[in-house]
Structures are given as structure tokens and as C-alpha cells.
A protein has these predicted regions:
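Helix N-cap at the beta1-alpha1 junction of Rossmann-like dinucleotide-binding domains, i.e.
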Residues: 10, 35-37
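Conserved Rossmann-fold cofactor-binding substructure of NAD(P)-dependent oxidoreductases
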Residues: 55-70, 77-80
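Rossmann-fold NAD(P)-binding glycine/threonine-rich loop
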Residues: 102-125
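Short beta-strand element of Class I
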Residues: 28-30
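Active-site-lining helix/loop region of Rossmann-like oxidoreductase modules
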Residues: 146-194
């Protein structure tokens, strides 16, 4: 399987590509980045014959569709997701290729879920939000809810400290997302899969 790793030389992309390299199903992995030198440096550092580097500006739709079309599967770690997720999934649907991403923003998640019918009509599977949070936290929520008689609301969130050992504070961005990531029956039924 020829895998296209959009953002494959970024922080999260490098980890995902490293894991993909262990899969016998991934016969080749194209590390695509808006900075060719960064992608090439990562590919050279890893030193696997399975990897190659390409430069892509994901805002250039026709070039993106052409690149996607030459692969069997797309993994997207390009951020920020509020800026790029919808345009990338739109191109993936047009190219009719299976897709996964690690979208961690609530608003683009809702936008991506709105593309469900288009993805189904294109005959593709698109799985969004398969990182740590959302992703693992959503699966943990499903397990937790299955152990309870009734669930009215469920809130998942992640946060990080300021680096202080005592009295660490969440960033305003994290607080904003905690408030917005109120998960109800809708999220559990949809499991963030389109």
C-alpha cells in the first residue's frame, strides 16, 4: 500500500510515520510537507527505502488531488486543523481515497462530520480524530459509558501546564476547548467516524 503522510515531517507526523514503517502493509510512505528540506531531512535521518520526501502546498487543490490520487491511503497530520482539515478532506473525497487524521479541534471536527454523505457517496472511509484526544479519550469515554446505567453528559478534554511544578495553569486555549468539548449522545453515536 502506498501511503501519503501529509505533514509527515511535523512533530506528530514523524511519530505516525515511524509507526507506519513497522507495518508490512505500508510498502511505501511519501512524507509530504510544505517545506521540502524538512521532509527530506526526516527521510534521510530515518534512512528507510520505504520513505520518500515531496513538497506540497495543501492549499493548491489541484496539485493536492494529483498527489493524493497517486497513493492508496492518506494520513493527515497537517495543522492547524481549523485552517486545513476541511480543504484536505475535500480533496481526499474528490480523489476517492481512504483517509485518517488526528484532528483535535472541535469546530473543524463538526465541519468534517458534515462531509459524511459525500465520503459515503465517494465510497471511501474517512476516520477523523484518531490521536490521543480526541481519539483514545473518545474510546475511553465509550467504555466508561458502557459501564454506567445512564449518561446525561460527558466532557473530554486535555490540557497542559505552564511548566511550573506547583500551581500550573491551563492555557486559555485549553480552557476554551474544555468548555467546547462537551460530548453528548451525538458524539458517542458518531464516534467521530465519517
Amino acid at each position: 500500500m502506498k501511503v501519503l503522510a501529509l505533514g509527515g515531517s511535523g512533530d506528530m507526523g514523524r511519530m505516525a510515520v515511524s509507526i507506519l514503517l513497522e507495518s508490512p502493509n505500508a510498502t511505501s510512505i511519501t512524507v509530504a510537507d510544505n517545506n521540502y528540506e524538512r521532509a527530506k531531512h526526516f527521510v534521510d535521518l530515518v534512512g528507510s527505502d520505504k520513505l520518500k520526501a515531496v513538497e506540497i502546498d495543501v492549499t493548491e487543490k489541484n496539485k493536492l488531488i494529483e498527489l493524493i490520487s497517486s497513493h492508496d491511503f492518506v494520513m493527515n497530520t497537517v495543522g492547524p486543523f481549523y485552517k486545513f482539515a476541511s480543504m484536505i478532506l475535500d480533496a481526499v473525497i474528490e480523489a476517492k481515497k481512504p483517509y485518517v487524521d488526528i484532528c483535535d479541534d472541535w469546530k473543524p471536527t463538526l465541519d468534517l462530520l458534515e462531509m459524511d454523505d459525500r465520503a459515503k457517496k465517494a465510497g471511501i472511509t474517512a476516520i477523523i480524530g484518531i490521536g490521543a484526544s480526541p481519539g483514545i479519550t473518545n474510546l475511553m469515554a465509550v467504555v466508561a459509558c458502557s459501564k454506567l446505567d445512564e449518561v446525561d453528559d460527558l466532557i473530554t478534554a486535555w490540557g497542559y501546564g505552564t511548566g511550573e511544578r506547583i500551581g500550573s495553569k491551563l492555557s486559555l486555549y485549553s480552557i476554551y476547548n474544555i468548555v467546547k468539548l462537551k460530548v453528548t449522545d451525538f458524539w458517542l453515536k458518531n464516534c467521530l467516524i465519517i
